[in-house]
Swiss-Prot record:
This is Calcium-binding protein CML38. Induction: By touch, salt and hydrogen peroxide treatments, drought stress, wounding, dark and infection by the bacterial pathogen P.syringae. Residues 1-44 are annotated as: Disordered. Potential calcium sensor that binds calcium in vitro. Ca(2+) 3 binds at residues 160, 162, 164, 171. Residues 39-74, 75-110, 111-146, 147-177 form the EF-hand domain. It comes from Arabidopsis thaliana (Mouse-ear cress). GO terms for molecular function: calcium ion binding. Expressed in cotyledons and guard cells of young leaves. In mature root, expressed in the epidermis, trichoblasts, young lateral root and root tip. Expressed from stage 9 to 15 of flower development in anther wall. Transmembrane segments: none annotated. Keywords: Calcium, Metal-binding, Repeat. One of its GO terms (biological process) is response to wounding.
């Protein structure tokens, strides 16, 4: 069986393609990024509706696969079944709207965590697993900010919950909220 993260990545891509778009003041088309939960829910409903080809209120693995194909994305039988299984809480082998919403929410959280891990890696020195005053100083220098090691110690101490003088990934994630 294939990796379960693949269907989620594909889900996110599909949702982006199906989300309503708007024009900005320069006339370019951009994704609609509303922080309003109601707008986000309407967008999800539109995506769900598109995928629910037979309009029975549930998305089958086959409907999921066909939705991907119409947008030029490939999803194997196994990936479609795995994607549905990830959020199928009632065990009927299909996704209702609530289950679909949960799958998208999980994907959003995983994507944010991966982005944070990527940013965290930029700030750590090779062979380290935390941000040290020295590694922070080097990264800030690359970004055009000249700081002393003592300045960096002070910056780290503001988010250093366990007072060990460095930032772990969890402390970094808290800082980035």
């Amino acid at each position: 069986m294939k990796n379960n993260t693949q269907p989620q990545s594909s889900f996110k891509k599909l949702c982006r393609k199906l989300s309503p778009k708007r024009e900005d003041s320069a006339g370019e088309i951009q994704q609609h990024n509303s922080s309003n939960g109601e707008d986000k829910n309407r967008e999800l409903e539109a995506v769900f509706s598109y995928m629910d080809a037979n309009r029975d209120g549930r998305i089958s693995p086959e409907e999921l696969q066909k939705s991907f194909m119409t947008l030029g994305e490939q999803l194997s039988d196994e990936e479609a079944v795995a994607a549905v299984r990830l959020s199928d809480t009632d065990g009927d082998g299909m996704l209702d709207f609530e289950e679909f919403s949960q799958l998208i929410k999980v994907d959003d959280e995983e994507e944010k965590k991966m982005e944070l891990k990527g940013a965290f890696r930029l700030y750590i020195a090779e062979g380290e697993d935390c941000i040290t005053p020295r590694s922070l100083k080097m990264m800030l220098k690359k970004l055009g900010e000249s700081r002393t090691t003592d300045d960096c110690r002070v910056m780290i101490s503001a988010f250093d919950l366990n007072a060990d003088g460095v930032l772990s990934f969890d402390e970094f994630a808290l800082m980035m909220r």
